[in-house]
A protein has these predicted regions:
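Single conserved hydrophobic/aromatic residue that forms the stacking wall/gate
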Residues: 2-7
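A structural signal for short, well-ordered beta-strand segments and their strand-loop junctions
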Residues: 52, 91, 107, 144-149
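Glycine/proline-rich loop-helix segments at beta-alpha junctions forming the active-site rim
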Residues: 1, 110-218
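Short, well-ordered beta-to-alpha junction loops that form the rim of enzyme active sites
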Residues: 20, 55, 147-151
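Residues lining hydrophobic/aromatic ligand-binding pockets adjacent to catalytic sites
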Residues: 23, 62-65, 141, 202
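Active-site loops and adjacent core secondary-structure elements that bind or stabilize anionic groups
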Residues: 10
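Short, surface-exposed acidic-centric catalytic microdomains
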Residues: 77-123
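Adenosine ribonucleotide-centric catalytic and binding domains
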Residues: 30-34, 38-96
């Protein structure tokens, strides 16, 4: 076994340990709930033309509920905007049986497990590329990827560099988009995190406008 393979196993074990820690210690208000506590994959319409890529499942959101962007403040904000443009049938995403449906869209985290401090390491992201790739391959009608935040954006670029020999220099910007090798567009979007919302970096009007643009592009 080579050094990189052994190192990769170390990072995997670290993530699994942290995921289990979150799921057993829980947050006070969710003490009576059983946390999903496993990797969180994508959700939505596999025939869709839009793919929304987040960073990773939230510690007490996706890691608790088992569905990406579900049960936390970021998901409340995101779905309010997706409902505004009729991508989502409702403006909330609370738990897996809440009746949520999304149209023409697939949502997935770049990293399938919650990382410590919400800061994934490059090695952790690389470990998830295989799963990410299999989701890409399922989405036969994909036309546009919306990357929520710079890390998700850079991960998509890295993925295309490794799998499609993509060499263009691109830079993350809210609403800025680029053409990728297989005729898919990649658009940057500020992450709907409470920090970004509370500091005014992103608001409902801006994000709704961005998703209106996304719908026009497809």
């Amino acid at each position: 076994r080579n050094h990189s393979s052994a190192a990769s196993d170390v990072y995997k074990r670290q993530l699994v340990r942290f995921r289990k820690k979150i799921s057993t210690e829980k947050r006070k208000q969710y003490m009576d709930q059983t946390y999903w506590g496993k990797p969180v994959t994508g959700f939505g319409d596999i025939n869709g033309k839009i793919m929304i890529v987040g960073l990773a499942p939230a510690a007490h959101g996706g890691t608790r509920t088992g569905r990406v962007f579900t049960g936390d403040k970021s998901s409340d904000f995101l779905y309010k905007c997706l409902h505004n443009v009729k991508i989502a049938n409702q403006s909330n995403s609370d738990h897996v049986n809440d009746g949520l449906k999304i149209k023409n869209t697939f949502i997935t985290p770049a990293l399938k497990c919650v990382p410590p401090g919400d800061k994934p390491l490059n090695e952790e992201l690389k470990n998830c590329f295989g799963y990410f790739k299999s989701e890409f391959e399922i989405l036969k009608n994909l036309k546009i990827i919306v990357a929520l935040g710079k890390i998700a954006f850079d991960t998509c670029v890295k993925f295309y560099r490794e799998n499609f020999n993509y060499t263009e220099r691109v830079k993350f910007g809210h609403g800025t988009y680029f053409k990728l090798p297989n005729n898919v567009l990649l658009m940057g979007c500020y992450h709907p995190s409470p920090r970004n919302v509370n500091t005014g970096r992103i608001n409902e009007k801006q994000m709704t406008k961005l998703f209106k643009k996304v719908k026009e592009l497809v």
